[in-house]
From Swiss-Prot:
Source organism per UniProt: Paraburkholderia phytofirmans (strain DSM 17436 / LMG 22146 / PsJN) (Burkholderia phytofirmans)
GO biological process, one term: L-tryptophan biosynthetic process
Record protein name field: Indole-3-glycerol phosphate synthase
GO molecular function: indole-3-glycerol-phosphate synthase activity; phosphoribosylanthranilate isomerase activity
Species classification: Bacteria, Pseudomonadati, Pseudomonadota, Betaproteobacteria, Burkholderiales
Catalytic activity: 1-(2-carboxyphenylamino)-1-deoxy-D-ribulose 5-phosphate + H(+) = (1S,2R)-1-C-(indol-3-yl)glycerol 3-phosphate + CO2 + H2O
Intrachain disulfide bonds: none
Family: Belongs to the TrpC family.
Organism domain of life: Bacteria
């Protein structure tokens, strides 16, 4: 595990302890039960059926490695732009300390469109999954580098019991093998090296042979051009999670359409 990931996980555990005091779990469960769910996996498959790329478009203000990506940051406006220009789903950063995200950003983005929404955060505790459902998320992220296999299995079971889709994220072959023990069809391959922070789409390409046909490969990070998209689609990768390239553009949705459609 990288030093930055170690630090983030330590902060997350502290955040959970504090949140449990201000919003007890049973209170969150009640709130979660009143929320509707949008079909995250179904939205991706609908794009595939239509012969289109399925793009999970990210609402992300900043990152630890790049700093602020977008000064004019209005989540509702960004969400509407993505929906208008063909996004399948949204991914919204809710981590405050490292990515300048917010639960409010997820709520605002989801309210502004009809797309399913992934809570993009560092999940280390069951509390965060119930919390995700309560805030209106339709899917959660599990990062293999941050969790033991048994933890991922338990967290996935809880998420599925609440109606949430699960995207499991891997960085290398060992993590991929662990992720394939889960039930989720969504296998995210992060092209960013956790030690150097460099990105290469070769990471995704190098793992494809090991992934069963019934899984949906989601390529993440480092997809910056139409050429990257065309190369990956030629390798039968049709699901993409993209943030930085869109966030740096004047009009995120227009950049989405330019790169993918």
């Amino acid at each position: 595990m990288s030093d930055i990931l170690d630090r983030i996980i330590a902060v997350k555990r502290e955040e959970v302890r504090a949140a449990e005091q201000s919003a007890p779990l049973e209170e969150l469960r009640l709130e979660a039960s009143s929320r509707d769910i949008r079909d995250f996996v179904g939205a991706l498959r609908a794009k595939h059926t239509a012969g289109l790329a399925a793009v999970i478009s990210e609402v992300k203000k900043a990152s630890p490695s790049k700093g602020v990506l977008r000064e004019h940051f209005v989540p509702a406006e960004i969400a509407r732009s993505y929906e208008k220009h063909g996004a399948a789903c949204l991914s919204v950063l809710t981590d405050v300390q490292f990515f300048q995200g917010s639960v409010a950003y997820l709520e605002e983005a989801r309210a502004a469109c009809n797309l399913p929404v992934l809570r993009k955060d560092f999940i280390v505790d069951p509390y965060q999954i119930v919390e995700a459902r309560a805030m209106g998320a339709d899917a959660i992220l599990l990062i293999a580098a941050a969790l033991e296999t048994s933890q991922m299995q338990d967290l996935e079971a809880l998420a599925h019991s609440l109606g949430l889709a699960v995207l499991v994220e891997v960085h290398d072959h060992d993590e991929l093998m662990e992720s394939l023990t889960l039930k989720t069809p969504l296998i995210g391959i992060n092209n960013r090296n956790l030690r150097t922070f460099e990105t290469s789409i070769e990471t995704t390409i190098g793992m494809l042979e090991a992934i069963p046909d019934d899984r949906i490969v989601v390529t993440e990070s480092g997809i910056l051009s139409r050429a990257d998209v065309e190369r990956l689609r030629a390798m039968d990768v049709h699901t993409f999670l993209v943030g930085e390239a869109f966030m740096r553009a004047n009009e995120p949705g227009v950049e989405l359409a330019r790169m993918f459609f």
